[in-house]
Regions:
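Short, solvent-exposed loop/edge segments of extracellular or virion-exposed proteins
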Residues: 4-20, 66-82, 127-142, 188-204, ...
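Residues marking helix boundaries in flexible regions
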Residues: 9, 14, 53, 86, ...
Length: 234
């Protein structure tokens, strides 16, 4: 009889004596998590006239790692058991923030794995200014309608409107500028109840009086009721 030793790596799975010429029966390899037994190498059909060492080996199993975003499959990869997992880069979606991957193990287990992520919609800041004055500042959800505020009344001026207001909120903060135009009012000069001259004057402008009219044999009294600057009325 001779010795038949069956090993996997340095581990002896079985060691037994077998009579010369008898059939050599290999043992069943023990189960190993995440691996498949690849078989015994060069097992003789019958026992030779010397001791033998028969080597066996395992192959590493691959398992499926599936990434899902908002319930839909994003990517699927095959990963060897026990491999350290490097997460897929976060997907990008304009106007949204990705939550990160949930359920991602550090190393690949001996089973298929599904990891999930979700997008949440962002809000951005919409600031409405006239000059240096902030009229309104508010958070607006990406893609929602941008509603401009009503501009405050300003004496002697007409609001000219907000410039370049987007229809819907973009994926960034915005500053929207507004402006006023100066109103014109009518300055009417009357002499002895009859209209002498009428001019259009911007609100707030310093008024320079019309030269005194002349009439032979008469003295002009001067202009009464003439303001220093043009008020917000005729």
């Amino acid at each position: 009889s001779y010795q038949a030793v069956f090993k996997i790596g340095e581990e002896v799975i079985e060691s037994k004596t077998v009579v010369y010429g008898a059939e050599v029966v290999a043992p069943e390899a023990p189960a190993k998590e995440g691996h498949t037994f690849a078989g015994w190498q060069d097992v003789p059909a019958t026992m030779p006239a010397h001791d033998i060492v028969v080597m066996g080996s395992y192959t590493v199993n691959k398992y499926t790692l599936t990434y899902k975003v908002d319930g839909a499959e994003y990517k699927s990869v095959e990963v060897d058991y026990g491999t350290t997992i490097t997460a897929e880069p976060a997907p990008e979606k304009e106007g949204y923030t990705f939550s990160g991957w949930q359920g991602l193990p550090e190393t690949m287990p001996a089973k298929d794995v599904e990891v999930t992520g979700t997008f949440s919609i962002n809000s951005y800041q919409a600031v409405f200014k006239i000059g240096e004055e902030i009229i309104e500042s508010k958070a607006v959800v990406y893609g929602e309608e941008v509603v401009a505020p009503e501009a405050p009344a300003k004496e002697g001026h007409t609001f000219a409107g907000w410039q370049n207001v987007p229809a819907t909120m973009p994926a960034h903060d915005i500053v929207v500028m507004g402006s006023y135009t100066v109103n014109k009012y009518t300055l009417t000069y009357k002499v002895d109840g009859a209209e002498y001259k009428s001019v259009e004057v911007d609100y707030g402008t310093t008024i320079t009086a019309e030269p005194a009219p002349e009439k032979e044999g008469y003295t002009f009294s001067g202009w009464q009721g003439l303001p220093e600057t043009m008020p917000a009325k005729d």
